[in-house]
Every structure is written in C-alpha cells, then in structure tokens.
From Swiss-Prot:
Residues the entry annotates as binding UDP-N-acetyl-alpha-D-glucosamine: 16-18, 128, 167, 195, 249, 268-273, 294
Family: Belongs to the glycosyltransferase 28 family. MurG subfamily.
Reactions catalysed: di-trans,octa-cis-undecaprenyl diphospho-N-acetyl-alpha-D-muramoyl-L-alanyl-D-glutamyl-meso-2,6-diaminopimeloyl-D-alanyl-D-alanine + UDP-N-acetyl-alpha-D-glucosamine = di-trans,octa-cis-undecaprenyl diphospho-[N-acetyl-alpha-D-glucosaminyl-(1->4)]-N-acetyl-alpha-D-muramoyl-L-alanyl-D-glutamyl-meso-2,6-diaminopimeloyl-D-alanyl-D-alanine + UDP + H(+)
Localization per record: Cell inner membrane
Organism per entry: Marinobacter nauticus (strain ATCC 700491 / DSM 11845 / VT8) (Marinobacter aquaeolei)
Gene Ontology biological-process entries: carbohydrate metabolic process; cell division; cell wall organization; lipid glycosylation; peptidoglycan biosynthetic process; regulation of cell shape
GO molecular function: UDP-N-acetyl-D-glucosamine:N-acetylmuramoyl-L-alanyl-D-glutamyl-meso-2,6-diaminopimelyl-D-alanyl-D-alanine-diphosphoundecaprenol 4-beta-N-acetylglucosaminlytransferase activity; undecaprenyldiphospho-muramoylpentapeptide beta-N-acetylglucosaminyltransferase activity
InterPro entries: GlcNAc_MurG, Glyco_trans_28_C, GlycoTrans_28_N, TAT_signal
Range of residues in the leader sequence: none
Keyword 4Fe-4S: no
Entry's EC annotation: 2.4.1.227
Keywords: Cell cycle, Cell division, Cell inner membrane, Cell membrane, Cell shape, Cell wall biogenesis/degradation, Glycosyltransferase, Membrane, Peptidoglycan synthesis, Transferase
Gene that specifies this protein: murG
Record-level GO cellular component terms: plasma membrane
Protein name: UDP-N-acetylglucosamine--N-acetylmuramyl-(pentapeptide) pyrophosphoryl-undecaprenol N-acetylglucosamine transferase
Length: 363
C-alpha cells in the first residue's frame, strides 16, 4: 500500500530494545507504504549497531542519562544538553523531515526540542504503563501523544491509545491452540533478560533447576546478554544443569514459537510481544525501573490470567523451582495462560501509530 504524497520521517529512539524495536516496526511499516525514513540515535547506544545494520540512514548525537552520574555530571549537564540540541538541530536541518517521531530514549529530548524549534510536527509514543520524564516534558511540544497503555500520562494530557508496535513476524504468529497443539514431554522455557540481559536470571535459574528432579527439569533456552555469556555458562556448569545459553536472540518470533513459557522482565516491549505471540510468562519486574513502571506493565497480563508476577526481592531458587514444577505438569494451564495473553494483543498497533504519524505529516 502506498500513501500519497510521499513523506519523510525521522524516527528517534535508542538505549534499549524496548524503544528501538517498536520504532523499527513503525519505520518498516512506513517504508512499506512508500515513505522515506531516517533515524536519530545516541552515539554508543545499541541503536548505533542495530540500525547501522539496516538500510535506514542513521544520524547520531552525543547524549546520555544523568541518573547516578554524580555532581560533576549534573554541573556539566546543561552544556552537554546544549551540545546535543545543537547536533540534533543540525541533523534536522539537513534531513528536513515532514514529521519527527519520538519513541523513547535520551535522544528524544534534544531531538524533540529541535523539532519544535524548526516547527516540525512531533509525535511521541510512550511504551510503558507509566510515562517517562522525557515524554511527559515533551507533551507540551507535541502534535500528537500516543500511549501503549491507557492512562500512562494521567488525566491532564490528551492521548491516543494505540498499543505497542511489535515486529511483524511476532504479530503474525499462529494462535496458541495451533502452536501448542500436541506438545508433550518436557516444558520448553525461554528465559529473556531483555536486550541487555538480567543478572538475577543468570544467577538464580541454574540454581532453581538444580533443585528440581532431572526428569522434571524443563528444556531451557536462555538469553543472558552479551556481557554475561561466560558467567551464565559457568553458572549452569557449576549447577550441573544443561541449557542453551545465547548472548542475544535476533529472531524472537522463532524463539517464542519454540517456547511453552517465558521467564522475563516486564518491559513494555516484552509484555506487548508476549501478548502478540500468545504465550504465558513468569514476570520478574526490574526493581529499579523508574516509578516501578515494569510492575504496572506486568499487572496488565496478571489481571488477565496470562502471567505470574514475582517481585525480585521475593525471587529465590526455591520459589522459582516450585513455580516451574507446578507449571511443568499442567499443560492445560500453559495453554490457558497463552490464550489469555493473546486476548490482550493489539495486532493493529503498528498500523495505528503509522496512521497518526501520517496525519501529523500531512498537517
């Protein structure tokens, strides 16, 4: 499908897969409709590698977070922000987009202000159940404010609830009844710590599996994060447990299709992909997430019966082993959780975000 006239969009997203992948899904959908897409990211961020490997032109600015960086970083922050704003403004003048789309990460702050200074329509999208500080601040400069979960900005901001764009190959997966039909034997458990890994899973899951009788242990595929590969492999070896340990999984649709159950954080992208794929989960929210937004994200699935939520302070090898043991012998519950997850899916999320972007670009 091609929309007319052809428009030029600048995507802004970076820092984590939770920002990059929804933005990439949106970018691909815009390209499929015949539009031109550019990307603004932060130098040194994961977007530099992920988008650098695509056909999308990538521009970078120098920007990073301020939390926990000390007094010197706070003193230098205004100067660094001004430099980042200048870099963003220069890129926007060169690219001349018809619409700027902010999907999260530090880059969206200076990029959003640069768009406002150049009178370019700004669309922002909040992936989490509680809006982040940068997006809250940018609402006053935005043409359109989109959110994945209702009420993430509170009652004072006019928003459009779209759901989270997910990768097309995940959104098009078979229904749980088809995917899980006829499965028997050991439970297949996919462990995902997010694009950066989760040390608590790397440490505790091998110990939990060691507590289970070998006949009851699930088959495990574990994404541990690139920096944690050797430590995670050593933890499994020390526990005397076999598992397939990978630093990063690029084909998540294939991984979800293999799994009966997922153990993971409750990041916005993860929750949205679990729902799109139709797969139940044991959720362990990141305890230091700003405003505890991961717990709010996870409650979306828990209330529907699609997930079990375990706060990290309560997560022990014993608790994890007992939970897995209960699920390993109850495939009926596994299917029920998967169907509940699929009922929460927003398969039209990408299309809705794209349509709002086109509306802004066309004025």
């Amino acid at each position: 499908m091609t929309d007319s006239p052809r428009r030029r969009f600048l995507m802004m997203a970076g820092g984590t897969g939770g920002h990059v992948f929804p933005a990439l899904a949106t970018a691909r959908a815009l390209q499929q409709r015949g539009h031109e897409v550019h990307w603004l990211g932060a130098s040194g961020g994961m977007e530099e590698r992920l988008i650098g490997d695509t056909d999308i032109p990538l521009s970078l600015i120098h920007i990073s977070g301020l939390r926990g960086k000390g007094k010197l970083a706070l003193l230098l922050a205004p100067f660094r922000l001004m430099r980042a704003l200048g870099e963003a403004y220069t890129h926007l003048r060169r690219i001349r987009p018809d619409c700027v789309v902010g999907m999260g990460g530090f880059v969206t702050g200076p990029g959003g202000i640069a768009a406002w200074l150049m009178r370019k329509p700004l669309v922002i999208h909040e992936q989490n159940a509680i809006a982040g500080m940068t997006n809250r601040w940018l609402t006053r400069f935005s043409e359109t404010v989109l959110e994945a979960f209702p009420g993430s900005f509170g009652d004072q901001t006019v928003t459009r609830c779209t759901g989270n764009p997910v990768r097309g190959e995940v959104a098009s997966m078979d229904e749980p009844e088809q995917r899980l039909a006829g499965r028997s034997g050991k439970l297949r458990v996919l462990v995902v710590g997010g694009s950066l890994g989760a040390q608590v899973f790397n440490q505790q899951l091998p110990q939990a599996l060691a507590l289970m009788p070998e006949a009851d242990r699930p088959d495990v595929r574990h994404q541990c994060g690139e920096k944690n590969l050797e430590a995670a492999q050593a933890a499994y070896e020390e526990a005397g447990v076999n598992a397939s340990v990978e630093p990063f999984i690029r084909d998540m649709a294939e991984a979800y299709g293999w799994a009966d159950l997922v153990i993971c954080r409750a990041g916005a992208l993860t929750v949205s992909e679990l729902c799109a794929a139709g797969i139940g989960a044991i959720l362990v929210p990141f305890p230091h997430a700003v405003d505890d937004h991961q717990t709010r994200n996870g409650q979306h699935m828990v209330k529907a019966g699609a997930a079990i939520l375990v706060p990290q302070p309560r997560l022990t090898p014993e608790v994890l082993a007992e939970t897995l043991k209960d699920l390993a012998t109850d495939r009926k519950r596994i299917l029920t959780m998967a169907k509940a997850a699929r009922s929460l899916a927003r398969p039209d999320a990408t299309e809705r975000v794209v349509n709002y972007c086109l509306e802004a670009a066309n004025g």
